């Protein structure tokens, strides 16, 4: 379907099907449409309401252009949509490190800061991790440690083609929804933090359509009503659980998992240096209780979707032990050292 027909359908207030959205995104990513047409297509898609079919179709188009990497089906991603303006430290990144120490295979897809002061790439880099390993080095790192960090610009170079247009539009489009679904390893297990409660069902259905095996879509809230794109240590967490094609909903509080509740200000983050120091202290076992328990809660969910814990409560115990026994600290050091070694070796081999 030519883009004019797609535009006509959207202008009539209709939504695009999976195939139509894929063709639309194929044309956008290949540079076949004018800037004016792309802006119109993206804006109308948003105005008409994004569907799970559209998200799945757009994802397929972008994933076909991704730099390939081969991990395995055990890999878990912990990520959020961003956009909650809560200013917390890098909880999902800390959770990935701790869950990995507990025995979860991690494929953390991330980037530098966009809506926050410090993104997952920023804090990992500050901790000493080499964030731009070539795919073959990342595969080796994963094979040795069960941990991989997949830097979005490295694996999705085609996204550069639309960066300027997205900035020009200046409002949210389907691209803002796609981020957590674009892990280049094609993970089947995820914790997806969603800041907008209205998007939870959309993510659950999109993940189902794209073959996810076990995912928890989480939306946290503080008791003051602040939305969070992560499990909340400051109030309730709404969960949609997708497991083998079936969905269930839950509303939980930290106390159900033997965790305390803490005000949002107690888990505030800051610069990359400050957030890295927070994570170091969590791993060292010297962090304030609020920081430690926020990371443990998210780690527990990763343990659950990763299949090593039978429930979140069991995952909490595993995450606690990884910290208290020193496993998390030693594991983080081993991952960082291995990434540096591989980066140096592959750099020598490419010279």
UniProtKB/Swiss-Prot annotation:
Source organism of the structure: Chlorobium luteolum (strain DSM 273 / BCRC 81028 / 2530) (Pelodictyon luteolum)
Cofactor note: Binds 2 magnesium ions per monomer.
Keyword GTP-binding attached: no
Protein name stated in the entry: Anthranilate phosphoribosyltransferase
Coiled coil (residue ranges): none
Metabolic or biological pathway: Amino-acid biosynthesis; L-tryptophan biosynthesis; L-tryptophan from chorismate: step 2/5
Keyword Manganese carried by entry: no
Keywords: Amino-acid biosynthesis, Aromatic amino acid biosynthesis, Glycosyltransferase, Magnesium, Metal-binding, Transferase, Tryptophan biosynthesis
Signal sequence extent: none
Gene that encodes the chain: trpD
Required cofactor names: Mg(2+)
Residues at which 5-phospho-alpha-D-ribose 1-diphosphate binds: 80, 83-84, 88, 90-93, 108-116, 120
EC identifiers of the protein: 2.4.2.18
Residues holding Mg(2+) 1: 92, 230
Function: Catalyzes the transfer of the phosphoribosyl group of 5-phosphorylribose-1-pyrophosphate (PRPP) to anthranilate to yield N-(5'-phosphoribosyl)-anthranilate (PRA).
């Amino acid at each position: 379907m030519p883009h004019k027909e797609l535009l006509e359908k959207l202008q009539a207030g209709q939504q695009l099907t999976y195939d139509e959205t894929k063709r639309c995104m194929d044309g956008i990513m290949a540079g076949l449409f004018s800037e004016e047409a792309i802006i119109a297509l993206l804006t109308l898609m948003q105005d008409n309401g994004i569907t799970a079919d559209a998200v799945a179709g757009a994802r397929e188009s972008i994933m076909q252009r991704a730099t390939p990497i081969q991990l395995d089906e055990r890999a878990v991603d912990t990520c959020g949509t961003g956009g909650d303006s809560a200013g917390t430290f890098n909880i999902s990144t800390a959770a990935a490190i701790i869950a990995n120490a507990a025995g979860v295979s991690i494929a953390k897809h991330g980037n530098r800061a966009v809506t926050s002061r410090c993104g997952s790439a920023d804090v990992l880099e500050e901790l000493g991790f080499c964030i731009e390993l070539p795919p073959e080095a990342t595969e080796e790192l994963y094979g040795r440690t069960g941990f991989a960090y997949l830097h979005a610009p490295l694996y999705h170079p085609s996204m550069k083609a639309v960066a300027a247009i997205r900035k020009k539009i200046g409002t949210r489009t389907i691209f803002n929804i796609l981020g957590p679904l674009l892990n280049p390893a094609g993970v089947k297990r995820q914790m997806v933090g969603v800041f907008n409660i209205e998007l939870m069902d959309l993510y659950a259905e999109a993940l189902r359509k794209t073959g996810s095996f076990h995912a928890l879509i989480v939306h946290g809230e503080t008791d003051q009503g602040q939305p969070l794109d992560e499990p909340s240590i400051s109030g309730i967490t709404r969960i949609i659980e997708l497991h083998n094609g079936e969905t269930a909903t839950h509303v939980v509080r930290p106390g159900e998992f033997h965790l305390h509740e803490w005000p949002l200000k107690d888990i505030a983050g800051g610069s990359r240096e400050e957030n890295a120091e927070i994570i170091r202290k969590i791993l060292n076992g010297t962090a304030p209780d609020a920081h430690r328990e926020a990371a443990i809660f998210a780690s527990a969910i990763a343990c659950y979707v990763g299949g090593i814990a039978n429930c979140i409560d069991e995952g909490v115990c595993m995450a606690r032990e990884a910290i208290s026994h020193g496993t998390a600290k030693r594991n983080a050091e081993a991952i960082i050292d291995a990434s540096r070694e591989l980066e140096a070796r592959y750099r020598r081999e490419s010279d």
